[in-house]
Amino acid sequence: MRIGINPNRHALATGYKPYVASAVVHLPNFEGYHEHRFEVVKTSLTTMRENAGLDCDILIWDNGSCQEFRDWLLDEYKPDGAVLGPNVGLTSARAGLLRIVPPNTIIGLADDDMYYYPSWFKASVELMRQFPNVGQVSGWPVRTQMRWGNKTTLDWARRYAVLEEGKFIPEQWDRDFCTSIGREWDFHVHYTKGDMDKRITYQGKQAYAVAHHCQFICKAENLVEILRQNKEAMSDDKVLDNAVDGAGYLRLTTIDRYTRHIGNVLDAELKAPARRRH
């Protein structure tokens, strides 16, 4: 039986700041692949908050992690918001995060093994505002990401900006990428020998024509609308990249490296305070 209509049925989410940094975490145990990941995840979440460079809320979606991690998350880290539940997968978790915050929120979405340098969020927001019709901005320049999901960005750049192709990303960043995913350097050099960085200059501002799906910021309502029109958009990383591109949005990455992938073991250099990006 029901009498009347719930007055909050169509109410929008409130209570969050205009900027929200979020991550999806899955740390079920400390065995095998996950043996050293507690340190990785703690470093990721800590640098995400401490190095944002602007006032933002922290929202964590926990996908079935162990109790020890959840105790640390709630008792020590203390995010502004947290969703704790069974492992529903990255796709469902990210879609859920987008719907938790108000539509006009600029939200950062990330995996739980990213490292953040000072002012990562601030720099991404500034880039988003300097270019028109931006769908995503990442702080992690990766050459191989420029193979797909950027047709709209490249077409726009050829018409309204200056587009350059070359090897602009520093070799050390490329080596760091290989280390984080366990790829041999010599193989990587051969595998990517035909790949070029695609750099855009627009009104004096520069960006790469790509946005990495492991870490990016976006306006929540834009991705929610894409998901409404294409229910498969979050089903896979490349599918998401292509869906945002297909919706007519620019996908950009900062020229400086503001974020990077850690992997499942924290390297010695990342244990020091995050003071530099190079």
Feature roles, as predicted:
Residues 1-6, 12-17, 186-278:
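C-terminal catalytic/acceptor-binding lobe
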Residues 121-220:
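Conserved catalytic core of nucleotide-sugar-dependent glycosyltransferases
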Residues 95-106:
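Active-site nucleotide-sugar/metal-binding loop of Leloir-type enzymes
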Residues 73-88:
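Conserved donor nucleotide-binding strand/loop of the catalytic core
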Residues 53-54, 59-70:
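A conserved acidic beta->alpha catalytic loop
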Residues 1-47:
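N-proximal low-complexity "stem/linker" segments adjacent to membrane-targeting elements
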Residues 104-115:
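Short beta-strand-to-loop acidic/aromatic patch adjacent to the donor-nucleotide binding site
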